[in-house]
Curated annotation (Swiss-Prot):
Cofactors: Ca(2+)
Free-text remark on how the cofactor is bound: Binds 1 Ca(2+) ion.
GO cellular component, one term: extracellular region
The protein's role, per its UniProt record: Snake venom phospholipase A2 (PLA2) that shows high lipolytic (1048 umol/mg/min) and weak ADP-induced platelet aggregation activities. Also shows weak anticoagulant activity (IC(50) is less than 1.0 uM). PLA2 catalyzes the calcium-dependent hydrolysis of the 2-acyl groups in 3-sn-phosphoglycerides.
Originating species: Crotalus horridus (Timber rattlesnake)
Class of this enzyme: hydrolase
Taxonomy of the source species: Eukaryota, Metazoa, Chordata, Craniata, Vertebrata
Membrane-spanning segments: none
EC number, as in UniProt: 3.1.1.4
Name of protein: Acidic phospholipase CHA-E6a
Length: 23
């Protein structure tokens, strides 16, 4: 689902220390 995808993106962003994803 879209929500699950967004959650995954946020996880990756946190672990990589990037803030390229913001909603």
């Amino acid at each position: 689902s879209l929500v699950q995808f967004e959650m995954m993106i946020m996880e990756v962003a946190k672990r990589s220390g990037l803030l390229w994803y913001s909603a």
